[in-house]
């Protein structure tokens, strides 16, 4: 199976982990194995890599790609289960690329792309509710909230209203059917700079896969799963994710919270983390090779104190 995916911020991410040859590393979103392969090549026989992905197609590709790597463990699961996967082990480095893979976008039948007509699916794991289920069963208020909050779409109200109106006549089953509804819901001037469906498709994909609801607690678990001196590196692709990661990382670095007028600290809080990479974006060279890296941001944090 071909699982074409160009890893973004490749060197920046791998270098951010400060890889130790004998260390334990986790790729929470291994995909086609680009970042994972670079890590595995830097490990000794004593080192170990755990490559996790929720997509069964990715898992099959990873099994083939790492068949000759006895120290690479392939796990079909979601990153919010990292504590159970590690089962008490502590990692020297953990990475997560939160974007949809190129394979998922370019495989029409997965239903992620608004550029190809296909069944409305958008499931990363091929399990649970699909995009069609969301579009055809959620109330107008629920759709409005999702499109507004997860897509930051200014025309969310009219899009939600038209979705509900159109589905009364016929079930909305394909990506292009949804695109047509979105286009009729906004003025022409709103379609000049980018595809009109981009924000709504993002919102529905986030809802289908529970991306943001799982992320906040998963970041806590990832950080807790590090050894002291271990590094967590996360790549985000939209502002909602990036703000969440930035805020969570800041909380790990927070020290004393006593009022300024207190002569001495009584709360006992000291920083648990130290920021090592602060929102690095793709270079001009990478953008020319891979335009999809435009919105990618890398943030890294080193654990300096145990929980």
Summary of predicted features, one role per range:
Residues 1-307:
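S-adenosyl-L-methionine-dependent methyltransferase catalytic core, i.e., the SAM/SAH-binding region
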């Amino acid at each position: 199976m071909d699982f074409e995916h160009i890893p973004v911020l490749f060197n920046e991410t791998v270098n951010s982990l400060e890889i130790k040859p004998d260390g334990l590393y986790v790729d929470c979103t291994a995909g086609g194995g680009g970042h994972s392969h670079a890590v595995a090549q830097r490990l000794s026989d004593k080192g170990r890599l755990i490559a996790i992905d929720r997509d069964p197609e990715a898992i099959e590709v990873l099994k083939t790609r790492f068949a000759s790597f006895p120290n690479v463990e392939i796990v079909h699961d979601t990153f919010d289960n990292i504590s159970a996967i590690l089962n008490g082990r502590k990692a020297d480095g953990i990475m997560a690329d939160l974007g949809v893979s190129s394979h998922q976008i370019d495989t029409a039948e997965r239903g992620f792309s608004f550029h190809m007509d296909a069944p409305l699916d958008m499931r990363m794991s091929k399990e649970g509710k699909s995009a069609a289920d969301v579009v055809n069963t959620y109330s107008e208020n629920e759709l409005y909230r999702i499109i507004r909050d997860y897509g930051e779409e200014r025309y969310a109200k009219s899009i939600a209203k038209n979705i509900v109106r159109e589905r009364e006549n016929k079930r909305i089953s394909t990506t292009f059917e949804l695109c047509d509804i979105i286009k009729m819901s906004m003025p022409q001037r709103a379609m000049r700079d980018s595809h009109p469906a981009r924000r709504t498709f993002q919102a529905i994909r986030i809802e289908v896969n529970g991306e943001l609801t799982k992320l906040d607690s998963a970041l806590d678990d990832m950080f807790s799963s590090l050894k002291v001196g271990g590094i967590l590196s996360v790549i985000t692709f939209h502002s909602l994710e990036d703000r969440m990661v930035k805020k969570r990382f800041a909380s790990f670095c927070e020290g004393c919270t006593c009022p300024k007028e207190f002569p001495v600290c009584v709360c006992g809080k000291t920083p648990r983390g130290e920021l090592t990479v602060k929102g690095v974006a793709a270079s001009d060279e990478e953008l020319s090779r891979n335009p999809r890296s435009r919105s990618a941001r890398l943030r890294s944090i080193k654990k300096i104190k145990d929980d």
